[in-house]
C-alpha cells in the first residue's frame, strides 16, 4: 500500500498523538522567544545595576592601564595582575552572565515544557541521505525561517542605526568624561538601545511563537485512517479500556447526582440503598428512577436530597426491590406500582402539610412489595 501523502492528513492530532510526540522530544520551540527574553533580562540587569557595573569595569580598566615598573623585572607580577583583572571582570559580569544563562535554560520551558528524551540523540542513518536534506533546504519551513531572519536583521539594523545617529553627539562626549562617568553613560546608552530593539522585535516574536505552534500541530496532523488505527490500538489496551470505563462511570455518576434535586422522593434502606424517584403525571406514564446507589453513594444521594428538601422515606423492602430491579432513567417495574403509588400519595400529602400546616402525615407502612422482588437474606440483615 502506498504511503499516505500530507494532503490526506487533514485531522488535528489526538491527545495520544501529542503525548507520544512529546515523549519523543517533538515539542514546539521558539528561538526568537529565547533570544528576546535573554535580551530583556540583560537590559534589566544593565538598567538597574548599571552604576555598580560601571564602577567595577572602570576600576578594572584603570588597573589594567596602570603600569608598574617592577613588572619589567618580575614576570610573576604580570601574571598576578592578569589574574586579578580576570577575577574582577568575572565578578563584575557575574550577575549579567548568570541571568542570561538562567533565562536561556528556563525560557524553552515556557512554550514546550520541560522534557528529556534520549530518542532525539539516537543516530539515524537516514539523515546521511542528501536528498531529504536538499528537500528541506527548499521547503516552506526553510523559506519562512529565512524570511524571518531577514526581517529581524533589517528591523534590528534600522533601530540600532537610527539610535546611533540620534545619539552620536552623546557618544562623542564620552571621550571627554572621566572613566567612571563615561562607563556609566555608555551602559545607559547601550541599555536604552537594547530596550528599543526589544520593543521592536516583540511583534515578530509573537508571530514566531504562533508560527512554531502552528507548524508543530501541522506536522503532527493525522489522516482519518490514522485516527481509526489509533482508536483500535487503544481499544486493545486493557489499561486504556479500564481508564475509559472509569471515566464513563464517573461521568454517569456525576450526571446522576445532578438529577437528585429533581426527584419527588428518596426511598432508602438506611444501612444499604437509596433510590430517588420522579413522577410527572403530565409527562410520564409511570414513575422513573433518576438516581440509585449503595453504600457511600447511597449516603451522598440522601445528603443531596436533604440539601434540596427532597422527602426521604425509610422503606427497606421497597428500596431493595427498586435498587435490584429498576434502572436509572427507566420506569419502575409494574409489580411495584402499588407500593410506589402509596409513597407518592404520602409525598403529595407532605407537600400540602408544608404549605398549609396542621398534623404531619404519617409515613406509609407495610408497603405491598412482592416477595419475588425482595431478598430474604438482606431482609434478615435489616432485622
Swiss-Prot record:
Q: Which residues lie on this side of the membrane: Periplasmic?
A: 1-32, 167-190
Report the function annotation for this chain: Required for formation of the rod structure in the basal body of the flagellar apparatus. Together with FliI and FliH, may constitute the export apparatus of flagellin.
Keyword Hydrolase recorded = no
Protein name, UniProt field = Flagellar biosynthetic protein FlhB
A biological process from GO: bacterial-type flagellum assembly
Instruction: Assign the protein's first listed, main location to one coarse class.
Output: membrane
Q: Which UniProt keywords apply?
A: Bacterial flagellum biogenesis, Bacterial flagellum protein export, Cell inner membrane, Cell membrane, Membrane, Protein transport, Transmembrane, Transmembrane helix, Transport
